[in-house]
Amino acid sequence: MKKIFKLIGKVFLGILAILAAVIIISGITHNILKPIEKNKYKIGQTVQVDGSNMQAYVTGAGDKTIVLLSGLGTASPIIDFMPLAERLSKDYKVVILEYFGYGFSDLTKNERSNKNIVNEIREALKALDVSGPYILMPHSISGIYSLYYALNYPNEVEAIIGIDTSAPNQTKRDKYEPMPSFLSLINSLGIMRDKSYLLPVTDNGMNINNYYTAEQMKINKVATAWNSANRTVLEEVNMVNANTEELYDVKYPEDLPVLALLARDTVDESQEWLTLHEELITNTKLQDIEILNGGHYLHWSNADKIVEITEKFISKNLR
């Protein structure tokens, strides 16, 4: 009997040793491949922001500048927004910024507060030599940063056109659950990379209208391996409650043109979604809400419609 227990113990230790070796190899492989892949697939231009590298993509020309700002945890905002940016660039200068922790940008230890993120946006635009005022086009959580930006630097924000953006008061009703920092090990040990390559690919609807090329979808996949659950993104997740609380009951400035494009799916899923955005409006002559059929990532399915609505909105309010 003792021999059997010893044998079982040895087998168990052997399995643990194999698992440890696999995890170590996975982590080493991931951290070797990550900079190689980033260099291979890099798109746009790199600017220095607070001593770190931030990636940006600038396209088009025109009297108006639209700045596209991504949702929380988007693997590569440049890839994510590319079809929309290409369409907008026919009439406008378009800038896509990849926050720290996203896409090809570095990680950062700076707190993911409204103040810091907005200052990084401003510094990046200055480094790109792109002058304002800007039309901010935020998706999801970037609606919070855009509101903060407009309130604190009104001369730099000409308008906001939101894509199913977060609203400050939503966390009064539904707090974000904190994410433990040790989850970043999932990223640094390459487990997200392993998952993306070993498990079947699930269709999240990103390419529902074939906006993206095969190469772009490939880059998005590797960017997911780089960035999912990294420490910077986790820090940003854990700042959502504080960042929204800072703007509780705040409304848009009365003289700021705003168009909130809401996703029909989100409105149907959350009874309060429309109300939360109506609460922000102070001037119905300049500020409006439009509901588009589709999911939270409206630019995956409605790029042409967003461009059409944007052109009408700018023509009416900003010319």
Please name every model-derived segment.
Residues 2-66, 90-92, 315-319:
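Alpha/beta-hydrolase fold catalytic core
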Residues 52-104:
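Conserved HGGG/HGGXW glycine-rich cap/lid loop of the alpha/beta-hydrolase fold
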Residues 73, 99-103, 145, 167, ...:
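Alpha/beta-hydrolase active-site loop signature
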Residues 96-137:
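Active-site loop/oxyanion-hole signature of alpha/beta-hydrolase fold enzymes
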Residues 132-175:
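Conserved hydrolase catalytic core segment
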Residues 166-198:
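A catalytic-pocket lid/entrance helix-loop region that shapes and gates access to the active site
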Residues 212-283:
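Conserved serine/cysteine hydrolase catalytic core
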Residues 294-303:
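Catalytic histidine-centered segment of alpha/beta-hydrolase-like enzymes
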